[in-house]
Swiss-Prot record:
Its main location: membrane. This is Photosystem I P700 chlorophyll a apoprotein A1. It comes from Synechococcus sp. (strain CC9605). The keyword Mitochondrion does not apply. One of its GO terms (molecular function) is 4 iron, 4 sulfur cluster binding. NCBIfam families: psaA.
Length: 767
């Protein structure tokens, strides 16, 4: 720790400025008010596109970093308000239009639904039989499972949450207005990183986890224990009364009664005395370390989850006391940065991390890039944990929800990581001052960019040629009727020995790292089959040649995505082709007339290309997950204990050829969506076709040039002039960048909605 004399701590002073900036709606009536050229109003149709492109580009409105910071801060409150309204809608649907109580009573047979279609012109065909006499649309968001884990036992509680979320939305909107128009933080407040770290670590994460642990201990754990006992057919008795249904469970405030809780968890009778006397073992019945899954619900033990949040809280509250603020003790981020000098042999940046502190505290794009990269990676990690360590009751046997949650978190992660590339490039163009980064680590990376990119390119070629080559070989051998010459588990076997070793290590490590645990970290790692209601909740995942092959396709596509994004960042300011790129900005179509071959080279264009490869990459990831789970994990458990998998284990033999992926996965599993008309999944059939159309529409923007459209427009304008109906606003073809933006947006929207319909129609029927 860097300890310094007391005078090094800065004195506390007001970091908020009283401003008189009246909140008015007048500006809403002046489109383009933020830009002098746009404020004059539209002369051509390009105006509306520039309006959309620049409305949120605060850097373009003003160069005052304090003003930009205040706008972003205020917008965050607006964003939170929208989130609370969205949450309120989810709670309201659960309270008003759902079969939540019916699902709670029989979660293994009743399907979750929170929407019923009104019969206006025959749409009621979409209302499927959810069980227990309820007709509706099946939801796959995991909300019911999450609500049960929270301890919600009735629709009345959901309605209270819906109202509470609206109140919170109102508070957030008010805070957003107040902190921009009345009392706005000064720039130094936004740049006070030590205070921010202390508050975010100890406050948001530490006390946030502690308060959630309190909820889990005092509400979730007792409620889920009572619910689990009902579901297991062995209801518990509280105060002499048998708790036979959700309606019998005490309301959350009744659990303030320590004696009531002690009947479920005797550790509560120890009170807080055990905490202060160090007798923490007294709490071991509600702060557990069991490991594995609850056999009744197929989810993590609620008492393990409580223990986890207590531990996280302790860690982060400690972490929130590490940084130097008004007292001269603790870490200084600037000193930590400037203390990093690099390795003279491996990384000879003589000035180490000098200049990075100022870059990260003056460039919000640089800060955002780091946060998006981390946030995106965390989202992808969450996707993996949702099936390997399912946290919510009955989530693991709701296969449509499991595919939905995996796909959702994978795609969110992909978009955030591409966003990281975008904002890193913007930071390089707008905020990077070469004079402040002489021979530091960032400067050295930029100097080595040719070596980095050419090596990464070589890796991509190697991975692509070899991984695709394995498939080409297998397709050729299968086409020629030579299965004995294929790469497969039964012929030329290529086992993923490293992945299998990791599985074994995880399975074995739990015994030494958590000796009192009852089970391992995850059943996926060489565990055992956990069945709930006759369905597989979790099971060991066998890995073989097919997994080895598709994993190297993943490696290839992910490396190409990284190559595109990293090249965009490292060459954002200059390149051999365009040495003065920084002067042209983040997005430009070409380097002016007379410079052939300089189009589509801006940092923006790298983000554009990166989005396609991100989509490519993650489509294969979600297809792999969906097929692997249906083939080797998910299914029904027979009376003799054997498992009948949904696709009968066909992954190992079919996923080793391209034809197998097309025939036994895409085509075989598209049966339900193609044949959905007239059934309750018909909407997915229409969506499947509609999304294909949106995808095809995108190609019109991606495969034709601007000149083509300008010629067409001029011909159409001529016809309008002939009829004397010429528009006052002159029509213009989209610019190259506008056209590519419209194209990629529809490409991704069409692709994602097609996949959504394909997954849902199939798994809702077979899952």
């Amino acid at each position: 720790m860097t300890i310094s004399p007391p005078e090094r701590g800065s004195d506390a002073k007001s970091q908020v400025e009283k401003v008189d900036n009246p909140a008015t709606f007048e500006l809403f009536g002046k489109p383009g008010h933020f830009d002098r050229a746009l404020a004059k109003g539209p002369k051509t149709t390009t105006w509306v596109w520039n309006l959309h492109a620049n409305a949120h580009d605060f850097d373009a409105h003003t160069s005052d970093l304090q003003e930009v910071s205040r706008r972003i801060f205020s917008a965050h409150f607006g964003h939170l308000a929208v989130i609370f309204i969205w949450l309120s809608g989810a709670f309201f649907h659960g309270a008003r239009f759902s079969n939540y109580s019916g699902w709670l009573a029989d979660p293994t047979h009743v399907k979750p639904s929170a929407q019923q279609v009104w019969a206006v012109f025959g749409q009621e065909v979409l209302n499927g039989d959810m069980g227990a006499g309820f007709q509706g649309i099946q939801i796959t968001s995991g909300l019911f499972q999450m609500w049960r884990a929270w301890g919600i036992t009735s629709e009345t509680q959901l309605m209270a949450l819906a109202i509470g979320a609206l109140v919170m939305a109102g508070l957030m909107l008010n805070a957003g207005v107040f902190h921009y128009h009345k009392a706005a933080p000064k720039l130094e407040w936004f740049q006070n990183v030590e205070s921010m770290l202390n508050h975010h670590l100890a406050g948001l994460l530490g006390l946030g986890s502690l308060s959630w642990a309190g909820h889990v201990i005092h509400v979730s754990a007792p409620v889920t224990k009572l619910m689990d006992a009902i579901d297991a057919g062995q209801p518990l008795v509280l105060n002499g009364k048998t708790i036979a249904s959700a309606a019998d469970i005490p309301l959350p405030h009744e659990f303030f009664n320590q004696d009531l809780l002690a009947q479920l968890y005797p550790g509560f009778s120890a009170g807080v005395g055990a905490f202060f006397s160090g007798n923490w073992a007294a709490y071991s019945d509600f702060l557990t370390f069991k490991g594995g899954l609850n056999p009744v619900t197929g989810s993590l033990w609620m008492t393990d989850i409580a223990h986890h949040h207590v531990a996280i809280a302790v860690m982060f509250i400690v972490a929130g006391h590490m940084y130097r603020t008004n007292w001269g003790i603790g870490h200084s981020i600037k000193e930590i940065h400037e203390g990093q000098k690099g390795d003279p042999l491996l990384f000879p940046a003589t000035n180490g991390h000098d200049g990075l502190y100022d870059f990260m505290t003056n460039s919000w794009h640089a800060q955002l890039a780091v946060n998006l990269a981390i946030g995106g990676s965390v989202s992808i990690i969450v996707a993996q944990h949702m099936y390997a360590m399912p946290p919510y009751p009955y989530q693991a046997i709701d296969y449509p929800t499991q595919i939905g949650l995996f796909t959702h978190h994978i795609w969110i992660g992909g978009f955030l990581i591409v966003g990281a590339g975008a904002h890193a490039a913007i930071a390089m163009v707008r905020d990077y001052d070469p004079a402040k980064h002489i021979d530091n680590v960032l400067d050295r990376v930029l100097k080595a960019r040719d070596a980095i990119i050419s090596h990464l390119n070589w890796v991509c070629i190697w991975l692509g040629a070899h991984s695709f080559g394995l498939y080409i070989h297998n397709d050729t051998m299968r086409a020629l009727g030579r299965p004995q010459d294929m790469f497969s588990d039964s012929a030329i076997s290529i086992q993923p020995i490293f992945a299998q070793w990791i599985q074994n290590v995880h399975a074995a490590a739990a015994g030494s790292t958590a000796p009192n645990a009852l089970a391992g970290v995850s059943e996926v790692f060489n565990g055992s089959v956990v069945a709930v209601g006759g369905k597989v909740a979790a099971a060991p995942m066998p890995l073989g040649t097919a997994d080895f092959m598709v994993h190297h396709i993943h490696a290839f596509t992910i490396h190409v995505t990284v190559l595109i994004l990293l090249k965009g960042v490292l060459y954002a300011r200059s390149s051999r082709l365009i040495p003065d790129k920084a002067n042209l900005g983040f997005r430009f179509s070409c380097d002016g007339p007379g410079r052939g071959g300089t189009c589509q080279v801006s940092a923006w264009d790298h983000v554009f290309l990166g989005l396609f490869w991100m989509y490519n990459s993650l489509s294969i990831v979600i297809f792999h997950f969906s097929w692997k789970m249906q083939s080797d994990i998910w299914g029904t458990v027979n009376a003799d204990g054997s498992v009948a998998h949904i696709t009968n284990g066909n992954f190992a033999q079919s996923a080793i050829t391209i034809n197998g992926w097309l025939r036994d996965y895409l085509w075989a599993q598209a049966v339900q969506v193609i044949n959905s008309y007239g059934s309750n999944t018909a909407a997915y059939g229409i969506m499947f076709l509609g999304a294909h159309f949106v995808f095809a529409f995108s190609l019109m923007f991606l495969f034709s040039g601007r000149g083509y459209w300008q010629e067409l427009i001029e011909s159409i304008v001529w016809a309008h002039n002939k009829l004397k109906v010429a528009p006052a606003i002159q029509p213009r073809a989209l610019s190259i960048i506008q056209g590519r933006a419209v194209g990629v947006a529809h490409y991704l929207l069409g692709g994602i909605a097609t996949t959504w319909a394909f997954f849902h129609a199939h798994i809702l029927v077979v899952g």
